[in-house]
Amino acid sequence: MEIYKKSEKKNDMPDDSVPYLMFGRTRDEVVQRVSEDIMIASAFSPTHGVMHASNVSLCDVWRRTYSDDSRHVIRSFCEMMNTVVGSMPGGEPPFRLAFENLWWPGLRLSDESDYRLLESNLEFEDWCICLDTGHLMNLLPDIYTEKDGVDALLDIFYGYSRDLVERIRAIHFHYSASYGYRSTFEERSMDCDAVSFIGSAYPHVSMIDQHLPFSEPRCVEILDVLEPDIVVHELPGNEKGPLEDFVKQRTLIG
């Protein structure tokens, strides 16, 4: 899976940045890198390991529409993961793999179609979904407030089938009400080298993906509907301290 199009080769990635920013230049390099990362992590016996089942071409990072197709991304992701896991003992990963949604092409979870495609193409059993509430809000229109986001997510989650709900074993819990920014930011072409362009995109992505703590009591209904085993309060903290956002959100759950 490419992080940029062939037309962008003039802004090629330096060799020492490739493993960290795009896993590899070729299919075999990507498979090797992901395999090594999983085996390194297995030494810690984690309950699960999270991977974003998505891809964005570098030229699309500062755009509202994307050149990649979600179904193609999911199929390519499954092919890669099947190759990675197929070489492991018993054809299963050493710990459960949790595939996370993003607003970029790939696993989005605004309905069941992405999940069904993932389910039908993966050839191993020990996997689950890690649903990121803020990432899903970043995909939806008209999310100006926390309440907008909570209401929109619950409308989606109440439409999930039971087997999808049971596959969601972890949640990254936070909100993002960034539609005002998403609908007005100035689009930008890739106008510098790849590493510099990625660096310049971090503030932009942070404006989209806000990782704010819930204060709306109805957010608890999200957990009641999805019944995850693990809830990660994925929050950065604020000027008062690194745990302030966590405490604010955690008190809502009881």
At which residue positions do the language-model features occur?
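Active-site-proximal loop/turn and secondary-structure-junction residues that shape catalytic pockets
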Residues: 1-3, 53-57, 101-105, 133-137, ...
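Short, flexible/disordered intra-domain loops and linkers
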Residues: 4-10, 59-69, 107-108, 141-150, ...
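Short N-terminal secondary-structure initiator segments
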Residues: 1-10, 73-74, 125-137
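Histidine-acidic metal/acid-base catalytic patches
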Residues: 31-47, 124-131, 137-254
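Extended interaction regions within the primary functional domain
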Residues: 5-16, 25, 65, 87-95, ...
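Active-site acidic/histidine proton-transfer and metal-coordination neighborhood
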Residues: 19-128
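Active-site gating loops and adjacent loop-to-helix segments of metal-dependent hydrolytic enzymes
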Residues: 2-25, 191-202
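Residue-level signal for well-ordered alpha-helical segments
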Residues: 14, 18, 26, 95, ...
